[in-house]
Curated annotation (Swiss-Prot):
Protein name (record): Metacaspase-1
Gene behind this protein: MCA1
Region (Disordered) residue spans: 1-70
Chief location of this protein within or outside the cell: cytoplasm
Gene Ontology molecular function: calcium-dependent cysteine-type endopeptidase activity; cysteine-type endopeptidase activity
Site, as annotated: Cleavage: R72, P73, K86, A87, K331, T332, K334, G335
Organism: Saccharomyces cerevisiae (strain ATCC 204508 / S288c)
Length: 432
C-alpha cells in the first residue's frame, strides 16, 4: 500500500528537519556494530562524497532543505533472538516427526548452472550463470516506519531473520553484511534514501565473476507514473525509504542503474523484495510463470486469476485477501489499457550479462501482506522464502517459485514473481 498521506507522520515532526542521535544507547548491541565492518570503514566517514554526483542529476530529490532530525520513539523495537527465530519460522522446522521431503521434495533431473558462457538464441548477446563460489556480500533493509500512521510490524524482524538465514546456512560472513533498519542509533545504518543508495553502491562495488551478492528489502512499496516508456502498465515501481516524504522514493529505473548495469558477466545478484507492487522493481526483462515459460502481458488472464482468488477468499471468509484481489482486478484493467510498449526494445535495454535473479512478493498491481506467521510479525513473502528454503534447500528456480506460491495461496492474494536479467533454465538448481 502507498504509505504516505499528509506530512505529519514521524512523531508529528512535520518536515522532520533532520536526524538526531537518540539519547539512549542502542537497543541491541548484537546488531549494532558487528556486521558490515568494511562498509563502515569505507562509508562511515565520507558518506555522500563519491557516488552522489553520479545519480544526483538524473534522480534528483525533491527541492527544499534536507531533513534535520529523526525523533525515534522511546519504546523498544521488536525483539529478536536467534534461537527464538529458529523455533518461530515453523512449528515443524526442527521437528524430527515432520518429513520435509513430503512437503517440498527436490525436483527431478535438476542440475547445477553451467559454467560456460551462454548466448541468447538468435542473437550474439552473451551471458553467464554464476557458480557462486567467490566472495559473498549482502545488503538487508527492513523499515517499520516507527511512529508513523503507516507503521509496519514485521519488516525489522524480516531483516534479522534473513541475516540469520544467510549466516547460518549460506556462508555469508557478518563482516560482509550491512543491515539498515529504522530502530538503530548509528545514523549510517538508518534506511534513509541517501544511506540506502550508498549501501546499494557498496553491495555491487568491485564485484567479480562468480561472486554472490544478496539484496533483501522489506518495507513499503508503491507506484509512480512511468516517464521513459519501459513499463507495460505505465507505472514505475518504487520503494519508500524512512525519509521518503522529504527525499522521495527510490524508483525501479534508479535501482536498475545502480545495481544491475555495473555488474560484470557471471556476477550473481539475488534480490528479494517483500513490498507492494514489486513485480518488476529491478526492471529485469524476463519474468517467468509457474509453468516455467516467459510471461507475456495478458490482462484478461490476470483478471480471471484474480477473480478466482477473490472467490476463494470470499468462500473462506478471508476479507483482507478478498479486498486485495478486487483491488488487483481494478488496477490490472486500468493499467493494461492503451499501453503500447515495444517489448523487445525494452528487453534489449534492460538485458544484463550478469546473473541477476529477483524474487518479489507480488505482481506490479498487487499489495504484499504484513503478516503474523508462527507467532511472529513478518512479511508474508520473507517468511515463505525462508520456510521453503529451510525445509528443502535443494530447489530449482521453478520449484522455488511454485512452493512459495503454495505457502501463500488461500491466506494472501499476492503472488510471488520470478524475474531475471537474462533467459534462465528454470529447471536448474537455485544457488546463491
Amino acid at each position: 500500500m502507498y504509505p504516505g498521506s499528509g506530512r505529519y507522520t514521524y512523531n508529528n515532526a512535520g518536515g522532520n528537519n533532520g536526524y538526531q542521535r537518540p539519547m539512549a544507547p542502542p537497543p541491541n548491541q548484537q546488531y549494532g556494530q558487528q556486521y558490515g565492518q568494511q562498509y563502515e570503514q569505507q562509508y562511515g566517514q565520507q558518506y555522500g562524497q563519491q557516488n552522489d554526483q553520479q545519480f544526483s542529476q538524473q534522480y534528483a530529490p525533491p527541492p527544499g532543505p534536507p531533513p534535520m532530525a529523526y525523533n525515534r520513539p522511546v519504546y523498544p523495537p521488536p525483539q529478536f533472538q536467534q534461537e527464538q527465530a529458529k523455533a518461530q519460522l515453523s512449528n515443524g522446522y526442527n521437528n524430527p516427526n515432520v518429513n520435509a521431503s513430503n512437503m517440498y521434495g527436490p525436483p527431478q533431473n535438476m542440475s547445477l548452472p553451467p559454467p560456460q558462457t551462454q548466448t541468447i538464441q538468435g542473437t550474439d548477446q552473451p551471458y553467464q550463470y554464476s557458480q557462486c563460489t567467490g566472495r559473498r556480500k549482502a545488503l538487508i533493509i527492513g523499515i517499520n516506519y516507527i511512529g508513523s500512521k503507516n507503521q509496519l510490524r514485521g519488516c525489522i524482524n524480516d531483516a534479522h531473520n534473513i541475516f540469520n538465514f544467510l549466516t547460518n546456512g549460506y556462508g555469508y560472513s557478518s563482516d560482509d553484511i550491512v543491515i539498515l533498519t529504522d530502530d538503530q542509533n548509528d545514523l549510517v545504518r538508518v534506511p534513509t534514501r541517501a544511506n540506502m543508495i550508498r549501501a546499494m553502491q557498496w553491495l555491487v562495488k568491485d564485484a567479480q565473476p562468480n561472486d554472490s551478492l544478496f539484496l533483501h528489502y522489506s518495507g513499503h512499496g508503491g507506484q509512480t507514473e512511468d516517464l521513459d516508456g519501459d513499463e507495460e502498465d505505465g507505472m514505475d515501481d518504487v520503494i519508500y525509504p524512512v525519509d521518503f516524504e522529504t527525499q522521495g522514493p527510490i524508483i525501479d529505473d534508479e535501482m536498475h542503474d545502480i545495481m544491475v548495469k555495473p555488474l560484470q558477466q557471471g556476477v550473481r545478484l539475488t534480490a528479494l523484495f517483500d513490498s507492494c507492487h514489486s513485480g518488476t522493481v529491478l526492471d529485469l526483462p524476463y519474468t517467468y510463470s509457474t509453468k516455467g515459460i516467459i510471461k507475456e502481458p495478458n490482462i484478461w488472464k490476470d483478471v480471471g486469476q484474480d477473480g478466482l482468488q477473490a472467490a476463494i477468499s470470499y468462500a473462506t471468509g478471508n476479507r483482507a485477501a478478498l479486498i486485495g484481489s478486487l483491488g488487483s482486478i481494478f488496477k490490472t484493467v486500468k493499467g493494461g489499457m492503451g499501453n503500447n510498449v515495444d517489448r523487445e526494445r525494452v528487453r534489449q535495454i534492460k538485458f544484463s550479462a550478469a546473473d541477476v535473479v529477483m524474487l518479489s512478493g507480488s505482481k506490479d498491481n498487487q499489495t504484499s501482506a504484513d503478516a503474523v506467521e508462527d507467532g511472529q510479525n513478518t512479511g508474508a513473502m520473507s517468511h515463505a522464502f525462508i520456510k521453503v528454503m529451510t525445509l528443502q534447500p535443494q530447489q530449482s528456480y521453478l520449484s522455488l517459485l511454485q512452493n512459495m506460491r503454495k505457502e501463500l495461496a488461500g491466506k494472501y492474494s499476492q503472488k510471488p514473481q520470478l524475474s531475471s536479467s537474462h533467459p534462465i533454465d528454470v529447471n536448474l538448481q537455485f544457488i546463491m
